[in-house]
Amino acid sequence: MAAKYVFVVAACSALAQAGIVRRDASTPLQDLEKHAAEFQKTFSEQLNAFTNSKDTKEFNTALKEGSDSVLQQLNALASSLQKALNDANGKAKEALEQTRTNLERTAEELRRAHPDVERQAGALRDRLQTAVQATVQETQKLAKTVGANLEETNKKLAPQIKSAYDDFVKQAQEVQKKLHEAASKQ
């Protein structure tokens, strides 16, 4: 009997410790928020550094191609959010809808700035930077809203949001790399 009692007390203690550790651990959406803030800062700093070099045709071409790929990724992210809307409800659904609308607006602004890259390289660079920053901010805001509302919804939506965000970041990093290569050739 004493052995059972000791076992039960040990099991309860282990469960209590696990609960404490679990509460202290960050959620995937909190990790996403933190990463988004760091990525946004790095992307802005590097883009500004690249554009302080000479404006050459090669850099402008890389800027246009980067803008194209960010535009495609913005559309993919908006599409992923639309799919996630089907699994959401309440405040999470409202946040997803607002984020998707804002991303579509950002994509449209980037699309309008696109045609005359040679003449408007500076404006396109600014729009590209704004598009990336807006996307990161919208994702952060979405993560906060979803994370603060429903743990059950969070479990369903967190992987979808994180996956879409990770795809966006990979594409934005590729843009950074190409712009860096173009700026280095000058």
Swiss-Prot record:
Subcellular localization(s) per the UniProt record: Secreted
InterPro entries for this protein: ApoLp-III
SUPFAM superfamilies listed in its UniProt record: Apolipophorin-III
Keywords of the record: Antibiotic, Antimicrobial, Cleavage on pair of basic residues, Immunity, Innate immunity, Lipid transport, Secreted, Signal, Transport
Subunit structure: Equilibrium between a soluble monomer and a bound lipoprotein form. Apolipophorin-3 associates with lipophorin during lipid loading until each particle contains 9 or 14 molecules of apolipophorin-3.
GO biological process, one term: lipid transport
GO MF terms held by the record: lipid binding
Induction profile: By bacterial infection.
Function: Assists in the loading of diacylglycerol, generated from triacylglycerol stores in the fat body through the action of adipokinetic hormone, into lipophorin, the hemolymph lipoprotein. It increases the lipid carrying capacity of lipophorin by covering the expanding hydrophobic surface resulting from diacylglycerol uptake. It thus plays a critical role in the transport of lipids during flight in several species of insects. Has antibacterial activity against the Gram-positive bacteria L.monocytogenes (MIC=6.5 uM).
Family recorded in the similarity comment: Belongs to the insect apolipophorin-3 family.
Signal peptide: 1-18
Principal location listed in the UniProt entry: secreted
A Gene Ontology term for the protein's cellular component: extracellular space
Taxonomy of the source species: Eukaryota, Metazoa, Ecdysozoa, Arthropoda, Hexapoda
Protein name: Apolipophorin-3
Tissue specificity of this protein: Expressed in hemolymph. Also found in hemocytes and fat body.
Propeptide: 19-23
The keyword Secreted belongs to this UniProt entry's keyword annotation: yes
